[in-house]
Regions:
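AlphaC helix of the eukaryotic protein kinase fold
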Residues: 40-55
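Conserved HxN/HPN-centered segment at the entrance to the catalytic loop
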Residues: 57-66
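Key residue(s) within conserved catalytic/signature motifs
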Residues: 59, 210, 229-231, 235-236, ...
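Conserved short submotifs of the Hanks-type protein kinase catalytic core
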Residues: 71-85
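Activation segment signature within eukaryotic-like protein kinase domains
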Residues: 102-103
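Protein kinase catalytic-loop region centered on the HRD/HxD motif
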Residues: 108-118
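C-terminal lobe helix-coil module of Hanks-type protein kinase domains
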Residues: 164-269, 322
Protein backbone atom coordinates (compact mmCIF):
# COMPACT_ATOMS: atom_id res chain seq x y z
CA UNK A 1 0.00 0.00 0.00
CA UNK A 2 1.63 3.28 -1.10
CA UNK A 3 -0.76 6.23 -1.04
CA UNK A 4 -4.13 7.26 0.37
CA UNK A 5 -5.16 10.83 -0.40
CA UNK A 6 -1.59 12.07 -0.43
CA UNK A 7 -0.30 9.86 2.35
CA UNK A 8 2.72 7.60 2.04
CA UNK A 9 2.49 4.47 4.17
CA UNK A 10 5.08 2.29 5.84
CA UNK A 11 4.23 -1.12 7.25
CA UNK A 12 4.17 -1.68 11.01
CA UNK A 13 2.43 -5.07 11.02
CA UNK A 14 1.44 -7.63 8.38
CA UNK A 15 -1.26 -10.30 8.57
CA UNK A 16 -5.04 -10.59 8.23
CA UNK A 17 -5.25 -7.21 9.92
CA UNK A 18 -2.29 -5.10 8.82
CA UNK A 19 -1.12 -1.85 10.41
CA UNK A 20 0.48 1.02 8.50
CA UNK A 21 1.82 4.43 9.49
CA UNK A 22 0.86 7.24 7.14
CA UNK A 23 2.58 10.59 6.71
CA UNK A 24 2.76 13.34 4.13
CA UNK A 25 3.72 16.97 3.66
CA UNK A 26 1.31 19.12 5.63
CA UNK A 27 -0.83 16.12 6.58
CA UNK A 28 -1.71 14.91 10.06
CA UNK A 29 0.06 11.60 10.81
CA UNK A 30 -2.30 8.64 10.91
CA UNK A 31 -2.33 4.90 11.45
CA UNK A 32 -4.18 2.74 8.96
CA UNK A 33 -5.57 -0.67 9.91
CA UNK A 34 -6.46 -2.77 6.86
CA UNK A 35 -8.41 -6.04 6.75
CA UNK A 36 -7.60 -8.81 4.30
CA UNK A 37 -9.72 -9.01 1.17
CA UNK A 38 -11.22 -12.37 2.15
CA UNK A 39 -11.43 -11.89 5.91
CA UNK A 40 -15.06 -11.23 6.91
CA UNK A 41 -14.24 -11.71 10.58
CA UNK A 42 -11.49 -9.12 10.32
CA UNK A 43 -13.88 -6.63 8.72
CA UNK A 44 -16.25 -7.09 11.65
CA UNK A 45 -13.38 -6.36 14.03
CA UNK A 46 -12.62 -3.05 12.31
CA UNK A 47 -16.29 -2.08 12.39
CA UNK A 48 -16.47 -2.96 16.08
CA UNK A 49 -13.35 -0.93 16.91
CA UNK A 50 -14.74 2.06 15.04
CA UNK A 51 -18.01 1.76 16.98
CA UNK A 52 -15.97 2.15 20.19
CA UNK A 53 -14.42 5.47 19.13
CA UNK A 54 -16.37 7.54 21.68
CA UNK A 55 -15.17 5.26 24.49
CA UNK A 56 -11.47 5.26 23.60
CA UNK A 57 -9.33 8.04 25.02
CA UNK A 58 -6.22 9.47 23.37
CA UNK A 59 -4.37 9.19 26.69
CA UNK A 60 -4.26 5.39 26.43
CA UNK A 61 -5.49 4.36 22.97
CA UNK A 62 -5.03 5.12 19.30
CA UNK A 63 -8.49 6.56 18.61
CA UNK A 64 -10.48 5.72 15.45
CA UNK A 65 -11.08 8.60 13.05
CA UNK A 66 -12.78 7.07 10.02
CA UNK A 67 -13.89 3.76 8.52
CA UNK A 68 -13.47 3.55 4.77
CA UNK A 69 -12.53 1.37 1.79
CA UNK A 70 -9.32 1.53 -0.17
CA UNK A 71 -8.46 -0.69 -3.12
CA UNK A 72 -11.19 -3.16 -2.19
CA UNK A 73 -10.09 -3.44 1.45
CA UNK A 74 -11.88 -2.23 4.54
CA UNK A 75 -9.61 0.24 6.35
CA UNK A 76 -9.80 1.90 9.74
CA UNK A 77 -8.04 5.24 10.16
CA UNK A 78 -6.61 5.92 13.63
CA UNK A 79 -4.97 8.92 15.19
CA UNK A 80 -1.22 8.31 15.29
CA UNK A 81 0.03 8.76 18.86
CA UNK A 82 3.57 7.96 17.76
CA UNK A 83 5.67 5.17 19.14
CA UNK A 84 6.85 1.77 18.02
CA UNK A 85 4.92 -1.52 18.24
CA UNK A 86 6.23 -3.33 21.29
CA UNK A 87 6.76 -6.56 19.35
CA UNK A 88 9.56 -4.79 17.46
CA UNK A 89 11.41 -4.30 20.75
CA UNK A 90 11.32 -7.98 21.73
CA UNK A 91 13.79 -10.79 21.14
CA UNK A 92 16.19 -10.19 24.02
CA UNK A 93 15.73 -9.79 27.77
CA UNK A 94 15.25 -6.23 29.04
CA UNK A 95 17.15 -4.88 32.01
CA UNK A 96 15.14 -4.07 35.12
CA UNK A 97 15.05 -0.30 34.69
CA UNK A 98 14.07 -0.44 31.02
CA UNK A 99 11.40 -3.04 31.74
CA UNK A 100 9.83 -0.98 34.52
CA UNK A 101 9.83 2.15 32.35
CA UNK A 102 7.60 0.26 29.90
CA UNK A 103 5.64 -1.93 32.32
CA UNK A 104 4.41 0.84 34.63
CA UNK A 105 2.74 3.00 31.95
CA UNK A 106 1.49 -0.19 30.28
CA UNK A 107 -0.28 -1.28 33.48
CA UNK A 108 -1.56 2.28 33.86
CA UNK A 109 -3.00 2.29 30.35
CA UNK A 110 -4.75 -1.02 31.01
CA UNK A 111 -6.13 0.43 34.24
CA UNK A 112 -7.80 3.17 32.17
CA UNK A 113 -9.20 0.61 29.72
CA UNK A 114 -10.86 -1.29 32.55
CA UNK A 115 -12.06 1.87 34.29
CA UNK A 116 -13.83 2.74 31.03
CA UNK A 117 -15.71 -0.56 31.35
CA UNK A 118 -13.90 -2.38 28.53
CA UNK A 119 -12.17 -5.74 28.32
CA UNK A 120 -9.55 -5.61 25.56
CA UNK A 121 -9.30 -9.41 25.06
CA UNK A 122 -6.27 -9.21 22.75
CA UNK A 123 -3.46 -7.70 24.83
CA UNK A 124 -0.15 -8.52 23.11
CA UNK A 125 3.01 -6.63 22.08
CA UNK A 126 1.76 -6.12 18.50
CA UNK A 127 -1.21 -4.14 19.88
CA UNK A 128 0.92 -1.87 22.09
CA UNK A 129 2.65 1.32 20.93
CA UNK A 130 5.58 2.50 23.05
CA UNK A 131 6.98 6.01 22.66
CA UNK A 132 10.60 5.89 23.76
CA UNK A 133 10.90 9.68 23.87
CA UNK A 134 7.88 10.41 26.08
CA UNK A 135 7.43 7.05 27.80
CA UNK A 136 3.79 6.98 26.71
CA UNK A 137 2.07 3.65 26.03
CA UNK A 138 -1.06 3.36 23.87
CA UNK A 139 -3.24 0.39 22.92
CA UNK A 140 -4.53 -0.56 19.49
CA UNK A 141 -6.45 -3.66 18.40
CA UNK A 142 -9.82 -3.16 20.11
CA UNK A 143 -11.55 -5.25 17.44
CA UNK A 144 -12.83 -7.89 19.88
CA UNK A 145 -13.04 -5.69 22.98
CA UNK A 146 -16.11 -6.19 25.14
CA UNK A 147 -18.24 -3.71 27.05
CA UNK A 148 -19.49 -6.49 29.32
CA UNK A 149 -18.10 -6.81 32.84
CA UNK A 150 -18.11 -10.60 32.46
CA UNK A 151 -18.94 -12.92 29.57
CA UNK A 152 -18.72 -16.60 28.68
CA UNK A 153 -16.47 -17.85 25.89
CA UNK A 154 -18.08 -20.83 24.19
CA UNK A 155 -15.80 -23.78 23.38
CA UNK A 156 -14.64 -23.41 19.79
CA UNK A 157 -11.92 -24.94 17.61
CA UNK A 158 -8.58 -23.26 18.46
CA UNK A 159 -8.30 -21.79 14.97
CA UNK A 160 -11.53 -19.84 15.39
CA UNK A 161 -11.18 -18.56 18.96
CA UNK A 162 -11.01 -14.76 18.89
CA UNK A 163 -7.73 -13.44 20.24
CA UNK A 164 -4.12 -14.60 20.12
CA UNK A 165 -3.48 -18.03 21.63
CA UNK A 166 0.08 -17.32 22.78
CA UNK A 167 -1.23 -14.56 25.10
CA UNK A 168 -4.67 -15.97 25.91
CA UNK A 169 -5.94 -16.56 29.44
CA UNK A 170 -7.10 -20.13 30.20
CA UNK A 171 -10.74 -19.08 30.58
CA UNK A 172 -10.69 -17.23 27.24
CA UNK A 173 -10.06 -20.52 25.42
CA UNK A 174 -13.59 -21.58 26.36
CA UNK A 175 -12.35 -24.75 28.01
CA UNK A 176 -12.37 -23.82 31.69
CA UNK A 177 -16.10 -23.48 32.47
CA UNK A 178 -15.25 -19.96 33.66
CA UNK A 179 -16.15 -16.47 32.43
CA UNK A 180 -13.90 -13.91 30.76
CA UNK A 181 -13.49 -10.61 32.60
CA UNK A 182 -10.90 -7.87 33.11
CA UNK A 183 -8.59 -10.33 34.85
CA UNK A 184 -8.22 -12.18 31.55
CA UNK A 185 -6.45 -9.07 30.24
CA UNK A 186 -4.15 -9.24 33.26
CA UNK A 187 -3.07 -12.76 32.26
CA UNK A 188 -2.20 -11.48 28.78
CA UNK A 189 -0.32 -8.61 30.42
CA UNK A 190 1.64 -11.21 32.37
CA UNK A 191 2.60 -13.03 29.17
CA UNK A 192 3.76 -9.72 27.70
CA UNK A 193 5.83 -8.94 30.81
CA UNK A 194 7.31 -12.45 30.72
CA UNK A 195 8.39 -11.93 27.12
CA UNK A 196 9.90 -8.53 27.92
CA UNK A 197 11.91 -9.89 30.84
CA UNK A 198 13.12 -13.17 29.33
CA UNK A 199 13.02 -12.60 25.58
CA UNK A 200 10.75 -15.64 25.18
CA UNK A 201 7.11 -16.64 25.62
CA UNK A 202 6.17 -18.68 28.70
CA UNK A 203 4.80 -21.44 26.46
CA UNK A 204 5.60 -22.67 22.97
CA UNK A 205 3.84 -25.57 21.29
CA UNK A 206 3.70 -27.46 18.02
CA UNK A 207 -0.02 -26.91 17.51
CA UNK A 208 -2.92 -24.85 18.93
CA UNK A 209 -4.39 -27.65 21.07
CA UNK A 210 -1.06 -28.18 22.81
CA UNK A 211 -0.74 -24.44 23.43
CA UNK A 212 -4.20 -24.37 25.01
CA UNK A 213 -3.15 -27.29 27.20
CA UNK A 214 -0.10 -25.31 28.33
CA UNK A 215 -2.19 -22.30 29.35
CA UNK A 216 -4.67 -24.46 31.25
CA UNK A 217 -2.46 -27.07 32.90
CA UNK A 218 1.27 -26.27 32.82
CA UNK A 219 3.21 -23.89 35.02
CA UNK A 220 5.71 -21.65 33.23
CA UNK A 221 9.33 -21.54 34.30
CA UNK A 222 9.63 -18.52 36.64
CA UNK A 223 11.35 -15.61 34.85
CA UNK A 224 14.16 -15.32 37.41
CA UNK A 225 15.19 -18.90 36.62
CA UNK A 226 15.73 -17.90 32.98
CA UNK A 227 17.31 -14.52 33.73
CA UNK A 228 19.43 -14.93 36.85
CA UNK A 229 19.96 -11.18 37.32
CA UNK A 230 16.22 -10.57 37.59
CA UNK A 231 15.01 -9.67 41.11
CA UNK A 232 12.72 -12.33 42.53
CA UNK A 233 9.87 -9.89 43.36
CA UNK A 234 9.53 -8.95 39.68
CA UNK A 235 9.38 -12.62 38.80
CA UNK A 236 6.72 -13.16 41.47
CA UNK A 237 4.61 -10.32 40.04
CA UNK A 238 4.66 -11.97 36.62
CA UNK A 239 3.85 -15.39 38.04
CA UNK A 240 0.90 -13.95 39.97
CA UNK A 241 -0.41 -12.47 36.72
CA UNK A 242 -0.05 -15.90 35.08
CA UNK A 243 -2.10 -17.76 37.68
CA UNK A 244 -4.47 -20.29 36.10
CA UNK A 245 -7.59 -19.03 37.86
CA UNK A 246 -8.79 -15.43 37.99
CA UNK A 247 -9.12 -15.48 41.76
CA UNK A 248 -5.39 -16.18 42.21
CA UNK A 249 -4.24 -13.37 39.90
CA UNK A 250 -4.05 -9.69 40.54
CA UNK A 251 -7.60 -8.38 40.56
CA UNK A 252 -6.85 -4.97 39.05
CA UNK A 253 -4.31 -3.32 36.79
CA UNK A 254 -4.01 -0.64 39.48
CA UNK A 255 -2.68 -3.28 41.88
CA UNK A 256 -0.07 -4.34 39.33
CA UNK A 257 0.91 -0.73 38.68
CA UNK A 258 1.34 -0.03 42.41
CA UNK A 259 3.65 -3.02 42.92
CA UNK A 260 5.71 -2.11 39.84
CA UNK A 261 6.14 1.46 41.12
CA UNK A 262 7.35 0.07 44.44
CA UNK A 263 9.88 -2.02 42.51
CA UNK A 264 11.10 1.03 40.57
CA UNK A 265 11.51 3.10 43.73
CA UNK A 266 13.56 0.35 45.38
CA UNK A 267 15.67 -0.25 42.27
CA UNK A 268 16.51 3.43 41.80
CA UNK A 269 17.19 3.96 45.51
CA UNK A 270 19.13 0.84 46.43
CA UNK A 271 19.91 -1.02 43.20
CA UNK A 272 17.95 -4.02 44.43
CA UNK A 273 14.35 -5.09 45.10
CA UNK A 274 13.76 -6.89 48.36
CA UNK A 275 10.78 -9.24 48.71
CA UNK A 276 7.53 -7.60 49.77
CA UNK A 277 3.87 -8.69 50.06
CA UNK A 278 2.24 -8.42 46.65
CA UNK A 279 -1.14 -6.85 46.00
CA UNK A 280 -1.44 -4.65 49.08
CA UNK A 281 -3.17 -1.99 46.93
CA UNK A 282 -4.99 -4.50 44.73
CA UNK A 283 -8.60 -3.71 45.62
CA UNK A 284 -11.30 -3.97 42.97
CA UNK A 285 -14.20 -1.51 42.95
CA UNK A 286 -16.45 -4.28 41.63
CA UNK A 287 -17.80 -7.34 43.39
CA UNK A 288 -16.56 -10.35 41.40
CA UNK A 289 -18.32 -13.46 42.68
CA UNK A 290 -16.04 -16.52 42.40
CA UNK A 291 -17.27 -19.08 39.88
CA UNK A 292 -16.13 -22.07 41.86
CA UNK A 293 -18.88 -24.65 42.26
CA UNK A 294 -19.75 -25.32 45.89
CA UNK A 295 -21.53 -28.39 47.20
CA UNK A 296 -21.24 -30.30 43.93
CA UNK A 297 -18.05 -32.20 44.64
CA UNK A 298 -19.88 -35.54 44.82
CA UNK A 299 -21.68 -35.10 41.49
CA UNK A 300 -18.51 -33.96 39.74
CA UNK A 301 -16.58 -36.91 41.19
CA UNK A 302 -19.25 -39.28 39.83
CA UNK A 303 -18.90 -37.84 36.34
CA UNK A 304 -15.11 -37.95 36.45
CA UNK A 305 -15.15 -41.54 37.70
CA UNK A 306 -17.40 -42.57 34.81
CA UNK A 307 -15.10 -40.85 32.34
CA UNK A 308 -12.04 -42.57 33.85
CA UNK A 309 -13.68 -45.98 33.58
CA UNK A 310 -14.46 -45.46 29.91
CA UNK A 311 -10.90 -44.29 29.21
CA UNK A 312 -9.35 -47.27 31.01
CA UNK A 313 -11.71 -50.05 29.96
CA UNK A 314 -13.45 -48.79 26.82
CA UNK A 315 -17.15 -49.11 26.16
CA UNK A 316 -19.76 -46.47 26.94
CA UNK A 317 -21.55 -45.21 30.02
CA UNK A 318 -24.66 -43.13 30.42
CA UNK A 319 -24.93 -40.72 33.35
CA UNK A 320 -28.21 -38.84 33.77
CA UNK A 321 -28.10 -35.43 35.45
CA UNK A 322 -31.53 -34.21 36.50
CA UNK A 323 -32.84 -31.24 38.43
CA UNK A 324 -35.04 -28.19 38.29
CA UNK A 325 -34.41 -25.50 35.70
CA UNK A 326 -31.59 -23.16 36.73
CA UNK A 327 -30.26 -25.42 39.48
CA UNK A 328 -26.85 -25.74 37.78
CA UNK A 329 -26.94 -28.96 35.76
CA UNK A 330 -24.97 -27.45 32.86
CA UNK A 331 -22.33 -26.03 35.20
CA UNK A 332 -21.76 -29.45 36.74
CA UNK A 333 -21.51 -31.21 33.37
CA UNK A 334 -19.23 -28.51 31.95
CA UNK A 335 -16.69 -29.25 34.67
CA UNK A 336 -15.80 -32.28 32.53
CA UNK A 337 -14.82 -30.09 29.61
CA UNK A 338 -11.25 -29.36 30.67
CA UNK A 339 -10.60 -32.98 31.61
CA UNK A 340 -11.79 -34.27 28.24
CA UNK A 341 -10.27 -31.76 25.82
CA UNK A 342 -6.76 -31.60 27.31
CA UNK A 343 -5.84 -35.13 26.11
CA UNK A 344 -7.33 -34.20 22.70
CA UNK A 345 -10.76 -35.54 23.49
CA UNK A 346 -13.96 -34.12 22.02
CA UNK A 347 -16.64 -32.58 24.22
CA UNK A 348 -20.14 -32.00 22.83
CA UNK A 349 -23.37 -31.19 24.60
CA UNK A 350 -27.05 -30.79 23.92
CA UNK A 351 -29.77 -29.51 26.18
CA UNK A 352 -33.40 -30.63 26.29
CA UNK A 353 -35.82 -27.74 25.83
CA UNK A 354 -39.44 -28.02 26.91
CA UNK A 355 -40.42 -25.84 23.96
CA UNK A 356 -39.03 -28.44 21.55
CA UNK A 357 -40.86 -31.50 22.86
CA UNK A 358 -42.30 -32.12 19.39
CA UNK A 359 -38.75 -32.43 17.97
CA UNK A 360 -37.44 -35.58 19.69
CA UNK A 361 -33.99 -35.46 18.07
CA UNK A 362 -33.31 -31.73 18.52
CA UNK A 363 -30.96 -32.31 21.45
CA UNK A 364 -28.88 -34.81 19.50
CA UNK A 365 -28.79 -32.43 16.54
CA UNK A 366 -27.59 -29.65 18.84
CA UNK A 367 -24.79 -31.87 20.14
CA UNK A 368 -23.69 -32.90 16.65
CA UNK A 369 -23.57 -29.26 15.60
CA UNK A 370 -20.74 -28.95 18.10
CA UNK A 371 -19.09 -32.17 16.95
CA UNK A 372 -18.64 -31.40 13.26
CA UNK A 373 -16.45 -28.25 13.65
CA UNK A 374 -14.22 -30.07 16.15
CA UNK A 375 -13.71 -32.93 13.71
CA UNK A 376 -12.96 -30.59 10.82
CA UNK A 377 -10.35 -28.78 12.91
CA UNK A 378 -8.86 -31.90 14.46
CA UNK A 379 -6.69 -34.72 13.21
CA UNK A 380 -7.42 -35.52 9.55
CA UNK A 381 -7.63 -39.28 10.19
CA UNK A 382 -10.47 -38.69 12.68
CA UNK A 383 -12.92 -37.77 9.93
CA UNK A 384 -13.13 -41.04 7.94
CA UNK A 385 -13.06 -43.07 11.16
CA UNK A 386 -15.99 -41.14 12.64
CA UNK A 387 -17.82 -41.18 9.31
CA UNK A 388 -17.57 -44.98 9.09
CA UNK A 389 -18.73 -45.44 12.67
CA UNK A 390 -21.64 -43.03 12.23
CA UNK A 391 -22.81 -44.78 9.07
CA UNK A 392 -22.81 -48.14 10.85
CA UNK A 393 -24.79 -46.79 13.79
CA UNK A 394 -27.31 -45.06 11.54
CA UNK A 395 -27.72 -48.25 9.50
CA UNK A 396 -28.44 -50.23 12.66
CA UNK A 397 -31.04 -47.71 13.82
CA UNK A 398 -32.68 -47.60 10.40
CA UNK A 399 -33.05 -51.38 10.43
CA UNK A 400 -34.82 -51.39 13.80
Amino acid sequence: MNELSGYVFSSLREGDIALYRGSGNGLTPILLVAAGETSPGCVERLEHEYALKSELDADWAARPVALTHDNGRMTLVLEDPGGTPLDRLLGRPRDVSHFLRIAIPLAGALRHVHQRGLIHKDIKPANILVNGATGAVKFTGFGIASRLARERQAPEPPETVAGTLAYMAPEQTGRMNRSVDSRSDLYALGVTFYELLTGALPFTAADPIELIHCHIAREPVPPHELASALPAPLSMIVMKLLAKTCEERYQTAAGVEADLRRCLTAWESFGRIDPFPLGLQDASDRLMIPEKLYGREGEIATLLAAFDRVVKHGGSELVLVSGYSGIGKSSVVNELHKVIVLPRGIFISGKFDLRLRDSPHSTLAQAFQGLIPQLLNGQTDDIPRCETRSRKLLAIRAAC
